[in-house]
UniProtKB/Swiss-Prot annotation:
Species whose genome carries this gene: Cyanidioschyzon merolae (strain NIES-3377 / 10D) (Unicellular red alga)
Residue ranges of the TM segments: 7-27
Keyword DNA-binding: no
Membrane topology: Single-pass membrane protein
Subunit structure: PSII is composed of 1 copy each of membrane proteins PsbA, PsbB, PsbC, PsbD, PsbE, PsbF, PsbH, PsbI, PsbJ, PsbK, PsbL, PsbM, PsbT, PsbX, PsbY, PsbZ, Psb30/Ycf12, at least 3 peripheral proteins of the oxygen-evolving complex and a large number of cofactors. It forms dimeric complexes.
Name of a matching Pfam family: PsbJ
Record's protein name: Photosystem II reaction center protein J
Lineage: Eukaryota, Rhodophyta, Bangiophyceae, Cyanidiales, Cyanidiaceae
Subcellular location(s) per record: Plastid, Chloroplast thylakoid membrane
GO biological process terms on file: photosynthesis
Gene3D superfamilies: 6.10.250.2070
UniProt similarity note: Belongs to the PsbJ family.
Length: 39
């Protein structure tokens, strides 16, 4: 953690949360539309 103090923890958590929600959203959208049914 060399960058501790340079990058706010809340900013990292916010970006990480948005990224996770985006990936999960795309996964469920693909499964719902039938594109991810083969995965």
């Amino acid at each position: 953690m060399a960058s501790t103090g340079r990058i706010p923890l809340w900013l990292v958590a916010t970006i990480g949360g948005i990224a996770v929600l985006t990936v999960l959203g795309l996964f469920f959208y693909g499964s719902y539309s039938g594109l991810g049914s083969s995965l």
